[in-house]
Amino acid sequence: MQTVRVFDTWVKASGRTLHFDVITSNEATALRLANEYVASQGHAAVSVTAQECRYCHAEPLVMFSEHQQRQFHESGGFIVPLTA
């Protein structure tokens, strides 16, 4: 069974807090995906670091949807938006 790593991410941007999980296999990919996600939310000037994007725990990949599993295999991971 394939296991993925969950990176809990909190980012302050333009007076609001973005909270999301990055599901991937390593920290470098987590930071890349986190920065891409933050930029897609209109905050390209914000840089996500390992201080905001921290490894939290591991989960089996099969617990996520087929779409998310496909994203993991095609892009190296995916984002799960959460409420702040």
Specify the residue positions occupied by each region the protein language model found.
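Short, charged/polar N-terminal "headpieces" of proteins
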Residues: 1-17
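Short, flexible N-terminal segments of the mature chain
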Residues: 17-43
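Acidic, low-complexity intrinsically disordered segments
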Residues: 37-84
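Alpha-helical structural elements
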Residues: 2-5, 32, 67
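Generic structural motif
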Residues: 12-14, 25-27, 84
